[in-house]
């Protein structure tokens, strides 16, 4: 789906240089079809970088996707220009009366912060409660998975003693599931988290279906049977260099991080890493858009059916 974004958004030129199809609002207005409305709640500090990563994955299907960027943290950003936020982001009050086909909630570097200490925790709870009646399907990524499991299922925060960082092998558990359609039997995806997601925890305390897990038995991809919510505990949106940037940042901060697993050639941080997960990431987001959003959402969003009966 060509993503439909404002003409002036920096991601337009960035993604076009990568041969990614981006449709600006001015061009899209000439096509007489209803685009899918997808809201992205961007919780990452480097918002422009995160926009590029997610928009890249939303760009590869034949229908238009109308992107709306949402922020819920009113504090001044140290990593994103205020002008960019003012021009391209909306506040929750701006969209709370609207309905959306899809919602993506990104990760956030909050793995060691207790939920109640997160500055915008009440706002996250508000958005998730709102989404039950206003969004067809929501996709949670990394830290957002942990937050959603707590809010929706009451599961306490599970934290690892060491950070999981690297590119890990996964295997699918339900090859005929719509969200894993076309996946290889085993595939690679990046992780960068303190959050812990043992598959047994998901099975014991939720009715969610685990669709793929790591070789160590951690849940990677799981979803509700009605397709209203889906969870991915890794970072399939990451660029080739993202884990390297995080690693060298932590080295400079004196944190003594472990070298990301299965990432640098020959395990040497001086070597340039290569992305080995792009096809997986693209297929995951295409499947979500098609089977969890497009095939289910009503043509007229005014007639949203929250229960999907």
From Swiss-Prot:
Where along the chain is substrate bound?
163, 192, 249
Q: For site (Important for acyl-CoA specificity), what residue positions does UniProt give?
A: 111
Q: Any keyword Transferase?
A: yes
| Pathways involved | Amino-acid biosynthesis; L-methionine biosynthesis via de novo pathway; O-succinyl-L-homoserine from L-homoserine: step 1/1
Which Gene3D superfamilies does this entry report, sorted A to Z? 3.40.50.880
Biological process GO terms, please?
L-methionine biosynthetic process from homoserine via O-succinyl-L-homoserine and cystathionine
Q: Does the keyword Acyltransferase apply?
A: yes
InterPro entries, from UniProt?
Class_I_gatase-like (IPR029062), HST_MetA (IPR005697), MetA_family (IPR033752)
| Reaction catalyzed | L-homoserine + succinyl-CoA = O-succinyl-L-homoserine + CoA
SUPFAM superfamilies attached to this UniProt entry? Class I glutamine amidotransferase-like
Sorted alphabetically, the keyword list is:
Acyltransferase, Amino-acid biosynthesis, Cytoplasm, Methionine biosynthesis, Transferase
Q: Which GO terms label this protein's molecular function in UniProt? A: homoserine O-acetyltransferase activity; homoserine O-succinyltransferase activity
EC nos: 2.3.1.46
Q: Where is this site: Important for substrate specificity?
A: 192
Which residue ranges traverse the bilayer? none
Q: Which GO terms describe its cellular component?
A: cytoplasm
* Membership in a protein family: Belongs to the MetA family.
**Quaternary state and interactors:** Homodimer.
Function description = Transfers a succinyl group from succinyl-CoA to L-homoserine, forming succinyl-L-homoserine.
This one is known as Homoserine O-succinyltransferase
């Amino acid at each position: 789906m060509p993503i439909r974004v404002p003409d002036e958004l920096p991601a337009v030129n960035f993604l076009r240089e990568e041969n990614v199809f981006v449709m600006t609002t001015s061009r899209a207005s000439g096509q007489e079809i209803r685009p899918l409305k997808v809201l992205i709640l961007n919780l990452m500090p480097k918002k422009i970088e995160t926009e590029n990563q997610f928009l890249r994955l939303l760009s590869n299907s034949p229908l238009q996707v109308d992107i709306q960027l949402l922020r819920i943290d009113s504090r001044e950003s140290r990593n994103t220009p205020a002008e960019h936020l003012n021009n391209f982001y909306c506040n929750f009050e701006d969209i709370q009366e609207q309905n959306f086909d899809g919602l993506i909630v990104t990760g956030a570097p909050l793995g060691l912060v207790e939920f109640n200490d997160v500055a915008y925790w009440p706002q996250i709870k508000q958005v998730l409660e709102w989404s039950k009646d206003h969004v067809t399907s929501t996709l949670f990524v990394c830290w957002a998975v942990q937050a959603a499991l707590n809010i929706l299922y009451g599961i306490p925060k599970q934290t690892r003693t060491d950070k999981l960082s690297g590119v890990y092998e996964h295997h699918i558990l339900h090859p005929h599931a719509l969200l894993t359609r076309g996946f290889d039997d085993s595939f690679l995806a990046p992780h960068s988290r303190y959050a812990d997601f043992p598959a047994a925890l998901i099975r014991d305390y939720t009715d969610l279906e685990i669709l793929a897990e790591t070789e160590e038995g951690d849940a990677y991809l799981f979803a509700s049977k009605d397709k209203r919510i889906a969870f991915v505990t890794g970072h399939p949106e990451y660029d080739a260099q993202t884990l390297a940037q995080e690693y060298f940042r932590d080295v400079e901060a004196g944190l003594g991080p472990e070298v990301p697993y299965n990432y640098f050639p020959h395990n040497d941080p001086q070597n340039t890493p290569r992305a080995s997960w792009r096809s997986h990431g693209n297929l995951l987001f295409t499947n979500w858009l098609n089977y969890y959003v497009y095939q289910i959402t009503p043509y007229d969003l005014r007639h949203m059916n929250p229960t999907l009966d």
